[in-house]
Amino acid sequence: MATRARATILLLLAAVLFAAAAAASGEDRRRETSLRRCLQRCEQDRPPYERARCVQECKDQQQQQQERRREHGGHDDDRRDRDRRGEGSSEEEDEGRERGSRRRPYVFGRRSFRQVVRSDQGSVRLLPPFHQASSLLRGIKNYRVAVLEANPRSFVMPTHTDAHCICYVAQGEGVVAIIENGEKWSYAIRQGDVFVAPAGTINYLANTDGRRKLIVTKILHTISVPGQIQFFFAPGGRNPESFLSSFSKGVQRAAFKISEEKLEKLLGKQDKGVIIRASEEQVRELRRHASEGGHGPHWPLPPFGESSRGPFNILEQRPRFANRHGRLYEADARSFHDLAEHDIRVAVVNITAGSMNAPFYNTRSVKVAYVLDGEGEAEIVCPHLSRGGRGGESEERRRERGKGKWREEEEEEEEQQKGQEEEEEEQVGQGYETIRARLSRGTVFVVPSGHPIVVTSSRDSTLQIVCFDVHANNNERMYLAGMNSVLKKLDPQAKELAFAASAREVDELLNAQQESAFLAGPEKSGRRGEESEDEDRRRRRSHRGRGDEAVETLLRMAAAAV
């Protein structure tokens, strides 16, 4: 008995030791994963001059976590430390965000942005690559969304990037300078302006307003590494670091023909950051050198018309659609020459409080929308999420779950191809998932081509959205309801077969809505419907009353005749 008891104890002890080792191993894996993610964010989202500091912060944070665990014997939440650095959140929050990503892979809240530039005078926030959030967004993996905010009378350092930048001025006014093909073009910009800074061109800007922030929303088309953007600063010093200082001293002396001492003094002096304060006189001189041109029509394109350089004010154009429920302004390659080679259309949508846009989809373009102001709700109809529920799962989470390490690019391609083949075997028309999302200032949402979308403004505020439509050439906007509904074009026989109803009944359905593009929202239309029903009831009662009076009159006349 004693021997059996001793054996049982030894087995239990071995089991405990094994469990402890497994737990420690699991904890080590979690720490390794957390550190790897932190380092990856440094590489992808931080400019070169901040990367070394970011890597050191990741290592320091990892060491602090280990010390806290040793001291307290538990797993402390390090969210405060990470938020202070703008580097994300804890493992538990990452998992929660993954679950949210699977439910709503096309919607990104304000917290999804990461600050890649921070100073007392402003910031630049960058949305992570779309394909990292969901495999459904692989089609726009080369695009990123960024928001620049510059305080009054601030200056953004000259830089160039390896991405084409299509910009919309959401608020304020300033000047922008772009050096391209050996020429410097300097323009005044204001709210409603669209301008383009091609990849590799040196550009800088200043907020010339003494009271308001300058806010510029951007979509960046990366051309080197898909989804990754690098900022290059030639002028600079220690912060931002000039890339000129990375050349050898001999190359620097030969290139500039000045002494090493002067070079070190010049390239090591600036340390105030990417966005700095400018004096009133400096701002006035920058404004004086800026051209006021470029806000008029940019069509026809050369050689049939004269090219007009500079920004294009979208809000000064005639709306594409306009009624009491909303307005749609657009700038495309036909109206703005600078967009011609980028296959992007820029649109600004204003939806009146309590109204909505008519349901529609784009035939070719992918809509990347940023909420400028107001609140509302978006409904996106998606067929992918109804097939097994894994369509919106993060690439990173799938890689970790599959092998516990990063897969090679070839394995990713094989997995994607396999998934596509499985999807092709699915039966079509077997259900859709409706993605519903609350919208507020700073929300980004993506609408893939072919996906129907409705955006409703809250009853308390007008909703204003800027949209960057990627792959805009030859795109058509197909409205599904309203006077311009594409369904009205169906043959009568097609209507009968498709709806299993008579063509007359289908026409009654399609012709009931007498407005186009922008409609009364659910609450407004609901109230109008109730008012209409009340009016019908009153009318019927009124008709009944007059009929009763007529009957009584006829009876009296008949009685008198008798």
Swiss-Prot record:
Residues covered by region (Disordered): 63-103, 383-430, 516-550
Domain of life: Eukaryota
GO cellular component: extracellular region
Disulphide-bridged cysteine pairs: none
Glycosylation sites: N350
Record's keyword terms, sorted: Allergen, Glycoprotein, Secreted, Seed storage protein, Signal, Storage protein
Gene Ontology MF: a single term: IgE binding
Ranges of Acidic residues composition bias in the record: 409-427
Signal peptide range: 1-23
Subcellular location: Secreted
Record Pfam families: Cupin_1
Biased segments, Basic and acidic residues type: 63-88, 390-408
Annotated ranges, domain Cupin type-1: 106-264, 312-507
Similarity section: Belongs to the 7S seed storage protein family.
Role, per record: Seed storage protein.
Protein name stated in the entry: 63 kDa globulin-like protein
Organism: Oryza sativa subsp. japonica
Lineage, top ranks: Eukaryota, Viridiplantae, Streptophyta, Embryophyta, Tracheophyta
